[in-house]
Amino acid sequence: MFDIKKELQKVPHKPGVYIMHDKNDEIIYVGKAIDLRRRVGQYFDSSKKLAKVAAMVSHVEYFEYIIVNNECEALVLESNLIKKNSPKYNIVLRDDKQYPYIKITNEKFPRVLKTRRVLKDKAKYFGPFPNAYAVNDIIDLIHETYKIRTCNLNFDKGQKLKRPCLNYYINRCDGMCVYDVNEEDYNKELLEVENFLNGREDELTKKLTDKMMAASKNLNFELAAKLRDSITNIQVILEKQNITNTKGLDLDMISMAREAETVCVQVFFMRNGKIIERQHFIIDNKYEESNEHIVGEFFKQFYIDLTYVPKQILTDIEIEDRDLIEEMLTEKKGSKVEIKIPKRGNKTDLLEMVRVNAKEGLDKYISRHLKRERNRENAILDLQDITGVKPIDRIECYDISNTSGVDSVGSMIVFKNGAKSSKDYRKFKIKTVEGADDYASHREVLTRRFRRLLDSDKKDNSFDEMPSIILMDGGKGQVNIAKEVLNEFNLDIPILGLVKDDKHRTRGIIYENEEIRLKVNTPLYRLLFAIQEETHRFAINYHRKLHEKNFKKSELDNIALIGEKRKKALMKHFKTLDRIKKASVEELCEVDGMNEKAAENIVNYFKQ
């Protein structure tokens, strides 16, 4: 048992990060402190607690802490832990869209790629870009202008080819896959690409202009026209605007808008005095944090993974931990970074433009959010009318997945108030059923689920909530199995079956032995379709992982002459390893690809 008062006495007076857990071992809050004992102790001092702090502390089952050298290290660690765990009571940065980046890989003869994931792999990332099509255009333009390779060869390991690919013959690559290419010359071209991606397009424009003039001189007017269009389109591709800063500065501009429990933080990126892109983030603010706290938390999480930090960041809000954040960013950049709050002049006008865009982004998000909420409410109301259950807070849906009866698994997915609740999803490895028996597998899954619900001695609390209704991915057979299981536990929960048409699309629901057809594009149809697809996806993913794991780790791997192909054929034919063990030489020889010697090896191996 974790005694909070006793554990507080063990916390050192040192800088670090503290982590609060609830009874389900979920991380619900992460914070930093110059003095861990004093800061953590404040949470449990009843005389000094605010209402929102009291709400969080009431759910704390235990805490842990990590000691670091200084407050700056604590800030970085806190930001990383918040980003990784998304604790319930922290301000969590959530991008309204997952924008793409352009990546220059960290390898011999680096490549230029499009990606949506920023990894800590020492590569260089540029973006994010609001327009995914623009990213494709930018990469195409780079490959048309510079001889940057597109192949996946690993030159660090010395991979080579006998003949170069098509790009070599159309003069888009120097063929380092076959010939010796000067790395220094290659990297010079790559540096021009980096400058272009940082908003300094002069070198690229000059290179294209020179090519255009040469093409025109050689009477190749078609190529010259194409190059002219590329020059014209550079501004459009990078989504540049006519707003400029005469000093040609690199800076970011950050503002926000808030309404009720929702906040939109807007960032504009200025490079070489020109605004090249923007990005906005939606933040849930159900605990009514101050603007200073929200934007301070935004700074910590937003800049922790960015590869490029400008010398200057403008904002119109006085942020928490400003000096500490400046110190963190300065250390990250390797040179001085300033966070400024301008009071007059051109920069205040620019920030006002950012604020207006934040308000616009917030209004659009709320409009979309309200529409989704209305659709969910209407779908739930329709379900209530069909089942007579009010309210419908929790929907559970079940599905079974296997490959020819091998590695059968069950899935339980949960929707709360019409929205998926992935933390409540559960996976079941089928233990008592051999082969592809959908009914028996469903019976096992449902029995295990509701036995845990009613088990008074259970250690696992994850099955404590009772569903309002149950959905079965199937027809009357699956529904009847579910009814039998619930009757065994004396439970009365409405059960609906989700039936599909010949094209495997949701057709309707089975309720009280009758099929109710659904009209496509109604809120109820969209909700049930989403639930059915999510259940199937979750089951399939778990089955594949389990199947791959079991396939890779098999006793058959220890037998001579049994490789991957034969192992796969044996499992497909016999379904289980136990059946293979019991098979005779003659039965084993019936399998595709097997011969007598390989069959004898299997029989002799399992006789040992």
Swiss-Prot record:
Source taxon at top rank: Bacteria
Compartment annotation: Cytoplasm
UVR domain location: 202-237
Gene Ontology terms: biological process: nucleotide-excision repair; SOS response
One GO CC term, this protein: cytoplasm
Pfam families the record matches: GIY-YIG (PF01541), HHH_2 (PF12826), UVR (PF02151), UvrC_RNaseH (PF22920), UvrC_RNaseH_dom (PF08459)
Keywords of this entry: Cytoplasm, DNA damage, DNA excision, DNA repair, Excision nuclease, SOS response
Gene3D superfamilies: 5' to 3' exonuclease, C-terminal subdomain, GIY-YIG endonuclease, UVR domain, UvrC, RNAse H endonuclease domain
InterPro entries to which the protein is assigned, alphabetical: DisA/LigA_HHH, GIY-YIG_endonuc, GIY-YIG_endonuc_sf, GIY-YIG_UvrC_Cho, Hlx-hairpin-Hlx_DNA-bd_motif, RuvA_2-like, UVR_dom, UVR_dom_sf
Chain ranges of the GIY-YIG domain: 13-91
Cited SMART domains: GIYc, HhH1
Disulfide bonds: none
GO molecular function annotations of the record: DNA binding; excinuclease ABC activity
Keyword Cytoplasm in annotation: yes
PANTHER family: UVRABC SYSTEM PROTEIN C, UVRC/OXIDOREDUCTASE
Subunit structure: Interacts with UvrB in an incision complex.
UniProt function note: The UvrABC repair system catalyzes the recognition and processing of DNA lesions. UvrC both incises the 5' and 3' sides of the lesion. The N-terminal half is responsible for the 3' incision and the C-terminal half is responsible for the 5' incision.
Family note: Belongs to the UvrC family.
Name of the protein: UvrABC system protein C
